Amino acid sequence: MLTADHPNRQRWSLAVTAFVTVVALAASACGSTSKPAGASSGGNPVNATFTYGAFTPVMVGWDPSTDYSNEIIAMNNMYETLTRYDSQTGQVKPLLATSWKKSADAKTWTFTIRQGVKFHDGKAMTAADVKASIDRTITVNQGAAYIWGAVKSIAAPNATTVVFHLKYPAPIDLISSAGYAAFIYDTKASGSTPPAKWFAQGHDAGTGPYTVAQYSKGQEIELRLKSFPGYWGGWSGAHYKNVVFRVVSTASTTAQLVRDGQITWAEQMTPQLWNSLKSDPNIVTTTATSYQNLFGMLNTSHGPLANVKVRQALAYATDYKGLVAAMGAFTPSIGIIPKGLWGYNRNLPAYQTNMAKAKALLQSAGYGPGGKAMTLNLTYTQGDQYEQTAASLLKSEYAPLNIKLNVASLAWPTQWSKAKSTNPASRQDILLFYWWPDYPDPYSWFINLFHSANPPYFNLAYYDNPTVDKQIDRVEPLSATNRPAAINLYTQIQTTLLKDSPALFLGTQTYERAMQKSVGGYVDNPAYPSVVFVYSLKPGQ
């Protein structure tokens, strides 16, 4: 089902990594510096600049059809989608489409396209451009293109109407709101140059409120965006007119730049640094539940963890409350679907720490205290402090059960390559791994992580349950026609997964943000991880 290339599922863990490794330097990294002209914490809002504090390079890619990594934070200010998901209400709202309707069988979706919209080159956007954008995304088939898997064909019968004809029912209104692979753009903007090559040169072709002003690869000020005068939303009232993406990999430096007003908004900090900013009267700190959770994927294909009793024993032996307390900025996970996303069920039979049950299960499998010793290999992403903390705690928690946990930190490409080995014996036993949805729907977790896949791609537990496969195959079409029934089916699937224990559900991340007090109107939207929709904000006077 998932055939597209996914270059970096670890994006947000790596961003945090850069921030968490140097807490001890918080008081010493840099002195006070002067505030630049147009900084958001003051000055004239007519020319106000919003400076985003990033921790890893922003523009990993430039192609709106294939982007699937850090660039989401910039792309969503240059490009727009047909719809946008409102996490506060759980509703899909109009954006480049003003309205839509579906057939009774949810296999035909008709969208009315907003008039008066221009691309950044001045060309008027029509329904034909919408069709061309999504057709190219499907044809290129990279990044998150799989989200359009239900589409059989797209028609643009006139300038303001787009019709999706589907192979099976799917929630196209929700899919159209995705932060990846759903951007509408001028597919002809590159002229005679191949689009992929043209985009890679640092060009954009969107309809969004901002367009590229300057790109400096590898520099601290990596990307500057400027307001697009022809933006359909208009520029009346107070808006940020410029957006800067500043890459600062040192935690203490970023915190100091926030204090000095040189960074408007910082995406994530250690709890220590974040708490240190709470007392500053010029800074606002916020928290928000994310849709990003941390898994311990268990190797069900080889070794001791091929035995479900051993997997269940590890699930009972894990101190979930202790884990989230030690990691900070996490809450316990109840099942797979995070709180705040439809399908979440707080009444699932989630595991609670029970060492007596863990010992009994291990002994029934021939292991445990007094039984055969067990050695397991765990890998985590190099430099990720949260994963490192989790790995250390799991090692100490499992030791009394006669389980030796060998822990290795690997660069993500190395870790992923090992996990995808076609030889089950070459894979790790436990892999620490983050996931978040490609659009605000539970389907992404289930089709990618727990549907059988050969060779493995993101099913890094190598879980293979034909009954669950059939349920996952049914649930996306059902979500478009009968959401209550889909929610019930997701509960059934999660109940089975909890029983079979192909993964440890270690926690859901909490976003801890810091921003200038002068920023008005900010609302965190976990459907778009760490994206700030700058146009919607109001700079302070």
Where is each model-derived feature located?
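Detector for C-terminal structural segments
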Residues: 25, 318-346, 386-395, 420-541
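Alpha-helical secondary-structure segments
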Residues: 51, 126-133, 159-165, 208-209, ...
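Ligand-site clamp/hinge motif
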Residues: 230-276, 404
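Aromatic- and charge-enriched surface segment that lines or borders ligand/interaction sites
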Residues: 98-142, 157, 163-165, 260, ...
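Gly/Pro-rich hinge or "lid" segments in bacterial periplasmic/extracellular proteins
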Residues: 88-91, 179-238, 242
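Surface-exposed binding/hinge segments that line
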Residues: 112, 146-191, 216
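Bacterial lipoprotein signal-peptidase II cleavage site
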Residues: 30-39
